Amino acid sequence: VSPQTETLRARYAAAGLTQDAVARDPFAQFRQWLEQACAADLWEPNAMVLATAAWPESAGAAAADPDQLAAAAAPSQRSVLMKGFDARGFVFFTNHGSRKARQMARNAAVSALFPWYALHRQVLVEGVVERVDAVESRDYFHSRPRDAQLGAWASRQSEALASRRDLESRMARTTARFDGAEVPLPEFWGGYRIRPHRIEFWQGRTHRLHDRILYTRDAVAAGAGDGDARAGDGDVHAGDGDAGAGDGDAHAGDGDAGAGDGVGDARAGDDGFDAAGAWKISRLYP
């Protein structure tokens, strides 16, 4: 018997979220919530649902044909693991030949959702994605367990696979290929950074009167550089464990999201902008 979904209803009783109480910097606010998600022992608190969509080469023709538009430009989603963040954005890693990477190559606009259901919270990030530099990709790749490094070489992500046996055979050949040697960073694998212009924090409340606090990036202030809104000193990275989410292109860790220094308890100014003028804070109707 299927569940009666129309009657499934949760009770929300969490404390509120106000403009006066949140950090002026969304990355500092995110750090606080991530630490609380880790402390609550949520499963893979750094997992996020990444949404991407390509745009057809012939936009006019596709728009005239709904089926073609759906096939060429429909958004797709998958769970990936956020492996670090700082004032520049949120970093994840994947195969450059994967479906999401191909879509991002044609349309850099993405969104990511952190769904912390047990805490009645979610964080929605919208922005533009860019590749991280080779050094950052190499450093992270070599921090992964060796089996995960070999798996990145063995997987032709998003391509059709005849059987599980074929995948295991590729893994065996890859293991033999690098036996006794360091596993190099594949040229087809690396990191991406979401540079957000919009970050929304959602807190469930009673009577469906939920709290929604929105940070929006001011384009002029953002152009002045990345130093005007800091979440702390350095990146925050999840651990290097072996529990994969979604496509399996990134691996969760120990829940070891370390807090950086310098996160103050600053408040937004009367005009809604933070002191550097980079982020505007506003409240949305639920």
Features from the language model and the residues they span:
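Binding-site signature for planar aromatic cofactors or substrates
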Residues: V1-V220, D228, D233, G269-P286
